[in-house]
From Swiss-Prot:
Site (Transition state stabilizer): 102
Start and end residues of each stretch annotated as Dehydrogenase ArnADH: 314-660
Example GO molecular function: UDP-4-amino-4-deoxy-L-arabinose formyltransferase activity
GO cellular component terms listed in the entry, alphabetical order: membrane
Record site feature (Raises pKa of active site His), residues: 140
BP GO terms, sorted: lipid A biosynthetic process; lipopolysaccharide biosynthetic process; response to antibiotic
Protein name as catalogued: Bifunctional polymyxin resistance protein ArnA
Positions of the UniProt region annotated as Formyltransferase ArnAFT: 1-304
Function: Bifunctional enzyme that catalyzes the oxidative decarboxylation of UDP-glucuronic acid (UDP-GlcUA) to UDP-4-keto-arabinose (UDP-Ara4O) and the addition of a formyl group to UDP-4-amino-4-deoxy-L-arabinose (UDP-L-Ara4N) to form UDP-L-4-formamido-arabinose (UDP-L-Ara4FN). The modified arabinose is attached to lipid A and is required for resistance to polymyxin and cationic antimicrobial peptides.
Species, as recorded: Shigella flexneri
Pfam families from the UniProt entry: Epimerase, Formyl_trans_C, Formyl_trans_N
Pathway(s) it belongs to: Nucleotide-sugar biosynthesis; UDP-4-deoxy-4-formamido-beta-L-arabinose biosynthesis; UDP-4-deoxy-4-formamido-beta-L-arabinose from UDP-alpha-D-glucuronate: step 1/3; Nucleotide-sugar biosynthesis; UDP-4-deoxy-4-formamido-beta-L-arabinose biosynthesis; UDP-4-deoxy-4-formamido-beta-L-arabinose from UDP-alpha-D-glucuronate: step 3/3; Bacterial outer membrane biogenesis; lipopolysaccharide biosynthesis
Protein residues bound to UDP-alpha-D-glucuronate: 393, 398, 432-433, 460, 492, 526-535, 613
């Protein structure tokens, strides 16, 4: 059976050996050039291919059409991937009639993504395994063909677990490859509700934060022990690496990071104590703990830092452009609730953020992003995370001012995206549920749903396509230039401070604010085209909590992801929204200050929005990516959101001239 193989590392070598032993004909092998900065303790796929007289290639981009065509010319019947580090495109999968199969180092659906070997140790797991699964567009999500469990012993470190996994993989392939060859396999779909996903790890992820329990720090040491880069800490500005450790249930009142003793070298933790058995100062040699203490000048009572003293207290700097807006001001409140964020904000007004202006970790400048380009570039360079939230996002403006929508929403934001590329800063970009347009799927899915908009002579779509093109530009920068990004798509977030009643008076607001204005002024609630259009309304608190988790980015799980943030359970038509709002209004303690309800009035969209408008019948999100990447799901019922939003706006109204 002819096959093309994508392989790297020890797993790649043993996968190739297993294929040859099972009688497969390998037409070509695709691998990687070795990274000179990486300690190469593993076997070389390139050397093995050369020894076995098999053509071997290491292209920068195997998904390029030229390489796809070359692979097609090889006419593979089946494709295998063994620890190949790049995603392989659908076009390549489809070249093999029997499909493509990948070997993954975990018990899928747990620990999808990168570095599962290290992550299971970091998280203190007692079991892992290897999985052979069918390859699909989403990484590690295809049906399972075979699995083998591997126990993780308390004394296992990364290299010993690696050897166990290699042994298990060899067994699994010996058992399974003949069945694939004869088309005799049973595939089991993965349970998406059990899936977890982890991102790549870098050496900087292995800081030892002494306020954590000793068991957690010991697991970190195990996960990145030699030949991985090692867990590390600092004495002042002197970095040292911990190669092996032991947990001591030492009851001590010492501050975390304090040296309890130097022989053995025992460090107080948030819970218990960690003995540093072996370690290394700087780029020196490995030595046992008490000698390391002497080398570092440690005595009982010395304090260790998780990072150099000069940066130990630096907060993550978050730049929010459009900080006075609905999302911006609520996000600022959530970030400042923690003690490890510094927020820098720009906007043309400050009414919604006045409560933060005296906060020591909030820095605000009043200005326009189209004018203050130098300030913005400087702060993109200065900050760690950038959220460009400035946009015209009210439907009436799409038909009333389409060019202004394009200039602000697309052109100004493109400049900010390019700053992030230039200075290698992480960008969290607010796309929109509008990008799905007139998609007919029951649930709008980030990875599979088609994005469908109307004809060019319907300017209503200029917002949608401006956002969609920016999404595609960001994605391309991520693929080609390594931009660290996450795209999030809010689905009808609502709550206090959504627009304002003055904006609603000129029609430039979202639906609920417009409806509240109608109730406050005693004017009819206008139902555009009957108000039958359905939306899924999401409480701002749920939305902001998801966005906060994106900023936190635990395990880099959000990198390169597109994430819907919405509440599919809170689906209602605009008419139903109006009825729920009216019922809440009639029960409100301030109701007697306002005019009688003037009823509902059906109006045509062309009369309300003007020429060139089209509406969407439904818009319901799939939130699988939010579950997978954020461990998030919305919790707040729509009625509670309506009640709180209405209460907020009614209490902003000057009641002196209202009837009583």
């Amino acid at each position: 059976m002819k096959t093309v193989v994508f392989a790297y590392h020890d797993m790649g070598c043993l996968g190739i050996e297993a294929l040859l032993a099972a009688g497969y004909e390998i037409s070509a092998i695709f691998t990687h050039t070795d990274n000179p900065g990486e300690k190469a303790f593993y076997g070389s796929v390139a050397h093995l291919a050369a020894e076995r007289d098999i053509p071997v290639y290491a292209p920068d981009n195997v998904n390029h059409p030229l390489w796809v065509e070359r692979i097609a010319q090889l006419s593979p019947e089946v494709i295998f991937s063994f620890y190949y580090r790049h995603l392989i495109c659908d076009e390549i999968f489809q070249l093999a009639p029997a499909g493509a199969f990948n070997l993954h180092g975990s018990l899928l659906p747990k620990y999808r993504g990168r570095a599962p070997l290290n992550w299971v140790l970091v998280n203190g797991e007692t079991e892992t395994g290897v999985t052979l699964h069918r390859m699909v567009k989403r990484a590690d999500a295809g049906a399972i063909v075979a699995q083998l469990r591997v126990a993780i012993a308390p004394d296992d470190i990364a290299i010993t677990l690696h050897h166990k996994l290699c042994h298990a993989a060899r067994q699994l392939l010996e058992q399974t490859l003949p069945a694939i060859k004869h088309g005799n396999i049973l595939e089991i779909a993965q349970r998406e509700n059990e899936a977890t996903c982890f991102g790549r790890r870098t050496p900087d992820d292995s800081f030892l934060e002494w306020h954590k329990p000793a068991s957690v720090l010991h697991n970190m040491v195990r996960a990145v022990a030699d030949p991985w880069p090692g867990a590390f800490s600092y004495v002042g500005n002197q970095k040292f690496t911990v190669w092996s450790s032991r947990v001591h249930p030492h009851a001590s009142k010492a501050q975390p990071g304090s040296v309890i003793s130097v022989a053995p070298l025992l460090i107080a933790c948030g819970d218990g104590a960690l003995e540093i058995v072996t370690g290394q100062a700087g780029d020196g040699i490995t030595m046992q703990g008490s000698q390391l203490a002497q080398m570092l000048g440690l005595v009982q009572g010395s304090r260790l830092n998780s990072q150099p003293a000069c940066t130990a207290r630096r907060r993550t700097r978050v730049l929010i452009l459009g900080v006075n807006g609905f999302i911006g001001n609520h996000l600022t409140e959530r970030l400042l609730r923690e003690d490890h964020y510094e927020v820098y904000g720009l906007d043309i007004g400050s009414d919604a953020i006045s409560r933060f202006l005296n906060h020591p970790h909030f820095h605000f400048v009043e200005g326009d992003i189209s004018i203050h380009s130098e300030w913005i570039e400087y702060h993109v360079k200065k900050c760690d995370v950038v959220l460009p939230l400035v946009a015209i996002a009210t439907p009436i403006e799409y038909t009333r001012n389409p060019l202004r929508v394009f200039e602000l929403d697309f052109e100004e934001n493109l400049r900010i995206i390019r700053y992030c590329v230039k200075y290698r800063k992480r960008i969290i970009f607010p796309s929109t549920s509008e990008v799905y347009g007139m998609c007919s799927d029951k649930y709008f899915d980030e990875d599979h749903s088609n994005l469908i908009v109307g004809p060019v002579n319907k300017p209503r779509w200029i917002y949608s396509v401006s956002k969609q093109l920016l999404d595609r530009v960001i994605w391309a920068y991520g693929e080609k230039e390594g931009l660290q990004f996450t795209l999030f798509l809010p689905f009808n977030w609502m709550g206090p401070r959504l627009d304002n009643l003055n904006a609603a008076r000129i029609g430039s607001s979202r639906a609920i604010t417009q409806l509240i204005l109608n109730l406050v002024e005693g004017s009819p609630i206008k139902l555009i085209d009957g108000g039958k259009q359905k939306r899924c309304f999401t409480d701002i608190r749920d939305g902001i909590e998801a966005l906060y988790h994106i900023i936190e980015n635990a395990g880099n799980r959000c990198d390169g992801e597109i994430i819907n943030i919405g509440n599919p359970e809170n689906e209602a038509s605009i008419e139903e929204l109006g009825e729920m709002l009216l019922a809440s209004f009639e029960k409100h303690p301030l109701r007697h200050h306002f005019p009688p309800f003037a009823g509902f009035r059906v109006v045509e969209s062309s009369c309300y929005y003007g020429k060139g408008y089209q509406d969407v019948e439904h818009r319901k999100p799939s939130i699988r990516n939010a579950h997978r990447c954020l461990d998030w799901e919305p919790k707040i019922d729509m009625q509670e959101t309506i009640d709180e939003t209405l209460d907020f706006f009614l209490r902003t109204v000057d009641l002196t001239d209202k009837p009583s």
